[in-house]
Amino acid sequence: MKLALTFLLILMILPLTTGGKKSDNQALKRLGARKFNENLSELNSACDDAWETCAWSRTCCSRNCCRGICVSRYYECP
């Protein structure tokens, strides 16, 4: 009888502990996504600054650390 009660108690507690881990993982993913977006906006502003200096020349693509963003936002690089 004690064994059955113990087993039942474990079955009741188990979803509570795994649910906490799941929400922690989701919180970490949201935090990672927020950090990624912050980094992306920094890259975008750096690219905007570089774009103003190089105007319509194609040097923005190769000279700065924002190659993919410049390409997707402005024009294709050779």
Swiss-Prot record:
Keyword set includes Secreted = yes
| Pfam family, any one | Conotoxin
What keyword terms does UniProt attach to this protein? Cleavage on pair of basic residues, Disulfide bond, Neurotoxin, Secreted, Signal, Toxin
List, in alphabetical order, the Gene Ontology terms for molecular function in this entry: ion channel inhibitor activity; toxin activity
Q: Where in the cell is it found?
A: Secreted
InterPro entries, A to Z? Conotoxin (IPR004214)
Q: Does the keyword Secreted apply?
A: yes
Residue pairs linked by disulfide bridges in the UniProt entry: 47-61, 54-66, 60-70, 65-77
- What is the reported tissue distribution? Expressed by the venom duct.
Proregion residues are: 20-33
Organism domain of life:
Eukaryota
* Signal sequence interval, chain numbering: 1-19
**Any one cellular-component term (Gene Ontology):** extracellular region
* Free-text comment about domains: The cysteine framework is XI (C-C-CC-CC-C-C).
> Which family would the database say this protein is a member of?
Belongs to the conotoxin I1 superfamily.
Q: What is this protein called?
A: Conotoxin Cl11.1
